[in-house]
């Protein structure tokens, strides 16, 4: 849901809005919309400028929502693996032993996914801090979003791949 919404918000061609309130260059915005693969044109150039940073925030919210789900799922796995519950287990290849309790299997993979996903969820707060006192138009501060967004997309993709690999190795205790 959130990822689809973020995609729709971002699938509008802002080309021609320039750094502030439009451009004096003759530009066929319908043509560039089609050629750049956008679904539609962002008609109001002032709206494009007012939305600077907001489109990135929509992606951050979508990724954060996915990270929240993955973090909670990982936390549940860690909880269900506790000695008190012992509902599930995983093979040695994705767990580690404890230095003081060698028989114990630590769910490191899921603990690290949980931690990484919690960091990803903080992205929206970082974005809000960057843009809180900016006026309309372009500001160099906004370029700080790009690296953070790319890093978070890579991180959530890696978390999903590792989670998918690991969850397929789950052993569910029978007769609980």
Language-model features: locations:
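Internal glycine-rich alpha/beta core junctions
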Residues: 1-133
